[in-house]
């Protein structure tokens, strides 16, 4: 609605998260015609690969898969948030395919990240975003979510006992 009512607003979206096409660097923009015209004139001639375009088109046609991924993410994001909150961790509210888990300090976040990596789980330490005490954890499949909860439960138990 805002894009339709203003001549200087652009809305962009990516196919990275819900469609799982992050590596293809495909997205779209909704904007007034004069802005789209300008973007067409300044963009590179082949700014989206043929494979990326084909994948994006296929993803748009398969809305049932998108709905399945959305529902899975909502369910397991809520589950993981509840599990980690019960461990005393602070989880920022999220509507994305990841949660931001805040630890007591940067050192505890680094040690939690190391514990998860030992279990084969890779998170993103977000110190470079000004959040040294936080980890960004993507909502994966059920097994991955349960593993994150398991390894962080073990880590926090050890931490509280002075062993982590």
What does each of the following model-derived ranges do?
Residues 23, 95, 130-133:
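Short acidic/glycine-enriched loop/turn segments that link adjacent beta-strands
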Residues 7, 30-35, 103-106, 142-143:
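Short loop segments at secondary-structure junctions
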Residues 107, 114-124, 128-164:
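PLP-dependent enzyme catalytic core of the Aspartate aminotransferase-like
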Residues 16, 98, 130:
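Residue-level detector of flexible, active-site-proximal loop/helix-junction positions
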Residues 13-14, 101-102, 123-126:
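Thr-Gly-centered strand-to-loop micro-motif
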Residues 74, 78, 83-119, 135, ...:
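Conserved PLP-binding catalytic core of the aspartate aminotransferase-like
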Residues 8-85, 89-92:
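PLP-dependent aminotransferase class I/II
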Residues 1-5:
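Conserved core of the PLP fold type I
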């Amino acid at each position: 609605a805002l894009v339709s009512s203003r001549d200087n607003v652009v809305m962009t979206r990516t196919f990275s998260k819900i469609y799982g096409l992050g590596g293809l660097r495909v997205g779209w923009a909704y904007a007034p015609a004069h802005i789209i015209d300008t973007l067409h004139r300044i963009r590179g001639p082949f700014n989206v690969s043929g494979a990326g375009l084909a994948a994006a088109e296929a993803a748009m046609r398969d809305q049932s898969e998108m709905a399945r991924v959305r529902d899975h993410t909502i369910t397991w994001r809520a589950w993981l948030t509840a599990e980690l909150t019960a461990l005393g961790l602070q989880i920022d509210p999220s509507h994305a395919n990841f949660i931001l888990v805040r630890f007591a300090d940067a050192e505890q976040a680094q040690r939690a990240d190391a514990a998860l990596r030992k279990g084969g789980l890779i998170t993103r330490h977000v110190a470079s975003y000004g959040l040294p005490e936080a980890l960004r954890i993507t909502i994966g499949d059920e097994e991955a979510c349960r593993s994150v909860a398991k390894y962080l439960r073990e880590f926090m138990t050890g931490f509280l006992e002075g062993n982590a």
